[in-house]
Amino acid sequence: MSIKSDKWIRRMAQEHGMIEPFVERQVRGSDDSRVISYGVSSYGYDVRCTNHFKVFTNINSAIVDPKNFDAGSFVDVHSDVCIIPPNSFALATTVEYFRIPRNVLTICLGKSTYARCGIIVNVTPLEPEWEGQVTLEFSNTTNLPAKIYANEGVAQMLFLESDEECEVSYKDRAGKYQGQRGVTLPRT
């Protein structure tokens, strides 16, 4: 497997719709308008999250069960800023819609700006031929409230191209998160 460069990412986005909307350079803001960077980087693509968040709450004192998840455990927040309570988490979705090629596996890593504040971004790999908006999980590991900014960089996607195509892709096996849009809760 080899990691793919900015040239490859740009070509795949522009010619094959791999990332939509696509920002072909890294946006950093200006002196009077600082933003957490997003867009193409040397060997990855920095994604943004939308302004729709689902913040976890324990008001129902429910048990967290991935096979029987209670959607009432979340509070919907529509804002350019999301405050995550101490030792809690929130879900969001990428602005970008992805179409992963059959011979590519995509890994998501959190941005160091957030990690240095105790905010961890978790996403499972984007498998070959998966497509959709990515549901992002932000964990606040601190004992203070933490802030996430919508429409700014939150994580980086790395694209790994295999030496050979997989026998069965995510699309072939009709994966349960295929084509997801918006924040998607656990499915079994």
From Swiss-Prot:
Asked if Metal-binding is a keyword of the record, the answer is: no
Q: Which residues does dCTP bind? A: K111, S112, T113, Y114, A115, R116, T135, L136, E137, Q156, Y170, Q180
GO-annotated biological processes: dUMP biosynthetic process; dUTP biosynthetic process; nucleobase-containing small molecule interconversion
InterPro entries for this protein? dCTP_deaminase, dUTPase-like_sf, dUTPase_trimeric
Question: What EC identifiers does the entry list?
Answer: 3.5.4.13
Q: GO molecular-function annotation terms?
A: dCTP deaminase activity; nucleotide binding
Please give the pathway this protein is involved in.
Answer: Pyrimidine metabolism; dUMP biosynthesis; dUMP from dCTP (dUTP route): step 1/2
Q: Which SUPFAM superfamilies match?
A: dUTPase-like
Catalytic reactions on record? dCTP + H2O + H(+) = dUTP + NH4(+)
Active-site feature positions: E137 (proton donor/acceptor)
**The organism sits in which domain of life?**
Bacteria
Keywords tagged on the record: Hydrolase, Nucleotide metabolism, Nucleotide-binding
Q: According to its UniProt record, which protein family does this protein belong to? A: Belongs to the dCTP deaminase family.
Quote the function comment for this protein: Catalyzes the deamination of dCTP to dUTP.
The family database entries (HAMAP family) matched by this protein are listed as: dCTP_deaminase
Assembly and binders: Homotrimer.
Name assigned to this protein = dCTP deaminase
